[in-house]
Amino acid sequence: ADKAASGVLTKLPQKQIQEMKEAFSMLDVDRDGFVNKDDLKAISEQLGRTPDDKELTAMLKEAPGPLNFTMFLSIFSDKLSGTDSEETIRNAFAMFDELETKKLNIEYIKDLLENMGDNFTKDEMRMTFKEAPVTGGKFDYVKFTAMIKGSGEDDA
């Protein structure tokens, strides 16, 4: 597990490791150093994902024993690194940005997410846009993409 952890530590940005450590610590209510299925569901939602029960059970099965921080980091880094690249996500938003302002009407985005593709629920929508950069009804997809991918590049 130590070998796996060192690999994880080199491929994740330090900021993301720190965020995951803080999240893990918040979940480990009894401070025993381990997380269970309910804890995993809560942390997934904090990270912007809504896994189903089957996925959570599968994640716990990936750990050879009780889920401590090292195993947690290893498992979640695989899940997080399995997402699209920052550029891919930004380009997907850009397809709807006809004026090339790097901003989209937030109501338009919400309508797309509710009625097309994954059909987001109201709760999923709330979780997704809870900390999204929205000013004057305009959603800044460049900042949002940097935020969800952990690059922290706000000046793009």
Curated annotation (Swiss-Prot):
Coiled coil: none annotated. Keywords: Calcium, Metal-binding, Motor protein, Muscle protein, Myosin, Repeat. The modification Blocked amino end (Ala) is found at A1. InterPro entries: EF-hand-dom_pair (IPR011992), EF_Hand_1_Ca_BS (IPR018247), EF_hand_dom (IPR002048), Myosin_RLC (IPR050403). Ca(2+) binds at D28, D30, D32, D39. One of its GO terms (cellular component) is myosin complex. Residues 15-50, 84-119 form the EF-hand domain. One of its GO terms (molecular function) is calcium ion binding. Pfam families: EF-hand_7 (PF13499). It comes from the Eukaryota. In molluscan muscle, calcium regulation is associated with myosin rather than with actin. Muscle myosin contains two types of light chains: the catalytic light chain, essential for ATPase activity, and the regulatory light chain, a calcium-binding protein responsible for Ca(2+) dependent binding and Ca(2+) dependent Mg-ATPase activity. PANTHER family: MYOSIN REGULATORY LIGHT CHAIN 2. This chain binds calcium. This is Myosin regulatory light chain, striated adductor muscle. It comes from Chlamys nipponensis akazara.
